[in-house]
């Protein structure tokens, strides 16, 4: 059973004595790993923000614009850094593109057209239908595990934070629940569970009684087994987060920030991501989900169709990039220099004229926004045919389309993680590969982004 730690469940564990079976019943993570010599490791980023555009945005209306009779006037097409851009639809992101703060990969291709399958695929870097797909952790869980050794005293948040994850969120797979995504629905008031309704003194008294009563079960290893050990870790983690003003403030934001970021759930997630990264409390991977892109009908309907999601994306991500670029990071860099940002859907949408229902259907070709974390911005890698329907020029050394596994390898490499790692601790006994190696042509970092 794979773990996703909803924030209500997370704090409920700490406030009661119920040891639910939230984690996989497996042995302690083994340390035996192997890697392939010669892997390209960039190590240019400390953090990653991954934005899952659930539903599949129309690439030819956003990151790979094609202007035709279908194009609404208010898209206000323009050219930025020789890139055709819908400036009326995405003005804030257009300004960041003009400031060379992100680039676009236009040669991406999916291997299927099923929402749930591909959304999971993009999070676990493999086909979920394959054998290891059933046990595979989210990329964020891998990052959390790999970065755990770098954790400093006082860094109280889990390594993997999910914002607005919803039903599409992939969990920690066979990894310990310690590396599961901590899923939060952001609010300007923060996380209410950080304080107990009966007050700190009453809570502390009850918590101490709980700890004393469960002491015999909290041995290492526990006589009941690994799941209880890991639930015990949840108690401890949740307790350290409570009644800490630094943690509390990391999840709060002002009305002015809420308005600036678009006054939407996605905007709230983006400003929360900014605050959490600035607080430097141990989070190294943040996944934000923005749905609403499945525009089979009425894609250009005023204030409907593509507009709500595009406006949320523009205000939220555009301001997140701008703010990170203005904030001090490590070693004289900015927070944007420290943070790789990736935004993509599971696939694209059909090109050319719209369908009879006024929309666009699922399509293999799509685009990815990628910036910060050492990426050279202001460019478009790869090129599609004039109708945006096929990859004309892949734009990178592999001379083929870019797949989800390549994006994952790029994320790992940017964070200094060896994407060729094989962990020999999986329940299948076959070795868990961060990127599956049975298809040697998949899973290559995109070097051209960093030059």
Model region roles, listed by residue range:
Residues 2-451:
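Ligand-binding pockets and gating/stacking loops
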């Amino acid at each position: 059973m794979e773990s996703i730690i909803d924030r209500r469940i997370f704090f409920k564990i700490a406030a009661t004595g119920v040891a639910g079976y939230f984690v996989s019943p497996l042995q302690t993570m083994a340390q035996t790993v192997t890697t392939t010599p010669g892997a390209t490791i960039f190590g240019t980023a400390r953090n990653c923000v991954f934005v899952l555009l659930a539903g599949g945005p129309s690439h030819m209306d956003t990151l790979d614009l094609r202007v035709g009779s279908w194009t609404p006037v208010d898209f206000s097409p323009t050219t930025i850094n020789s890139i055709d851009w819908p400036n009326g639809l995405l003005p804030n992101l257009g300004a960041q593109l003009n400031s060379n703060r992100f680039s676009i990969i236009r040669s991406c291709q999916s291997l299927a057209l099923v929402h749930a399958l591909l959304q999971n695929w993009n999070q676990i870097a493999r086909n979920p239908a394959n054998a290891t797909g059933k046990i595979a952790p989210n990329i964020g869980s891998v990052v959390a595990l790999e970065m755990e050794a770098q954790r400093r005293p006082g860094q109280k948040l889990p390594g993997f934070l999910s914002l607005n994850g919803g039903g599409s969120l992939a969990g920690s797979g066979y990894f310990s629940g310690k590396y599961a995504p901590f899923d939060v629905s952001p609010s300007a008031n923060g996380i209410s569970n950080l304080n107990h309704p009966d007050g700190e003194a009453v809570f502390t008294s009850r918590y101490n009684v709980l700890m004393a009563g469960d002491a015999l079960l909290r041995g290492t290893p526990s006589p009941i087994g690994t799941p209880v050990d890991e639930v015990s870790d949840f108690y401890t983690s949740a307790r350290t987060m409570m009644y800490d003003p630094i943690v509390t403030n990391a999840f709060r934001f002002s009305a002015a920030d809420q308005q600036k970021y678009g006054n939407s759930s996605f905007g709230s997630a983006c400003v929360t991501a900014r605050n959490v990264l600035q607080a430097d409390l141990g989070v190294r991977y943040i996944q934000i989900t923005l749905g609403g892109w499945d525009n089979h009908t009425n894609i250009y309907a005023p204030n409907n169709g593509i507009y709500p999601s595009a406006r949320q994306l523009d205000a939220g991500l555009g301001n997140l990039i701008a703010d990170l670029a203005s904030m001090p990071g490590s070693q004289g860099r900015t927070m944007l220099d420290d943070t790789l940002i990736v935004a993509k859907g599971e696939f694209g949408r059909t090109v050319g004229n719209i369908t009879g229902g006024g929309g666009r259907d699922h399509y293999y070709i799509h685009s990815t926004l990628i910036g910060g974390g050492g990426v050279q911005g202001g460019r478009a890698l790869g090129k599609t045919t004039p109708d945006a329907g096929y990859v004309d020029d892949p734009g990178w050394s592999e001379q083929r389309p870019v797949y989800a596994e390549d994006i994952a390898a790029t994320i790992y490499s940017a964070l200094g993680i060896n994407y060729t790692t094989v962990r020999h601790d999986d329940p299948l006994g076959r070795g868990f590969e961060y990127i599956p190696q049975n298809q040697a042509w998949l899973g290559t970092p995109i070097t051209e982004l960093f030059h």
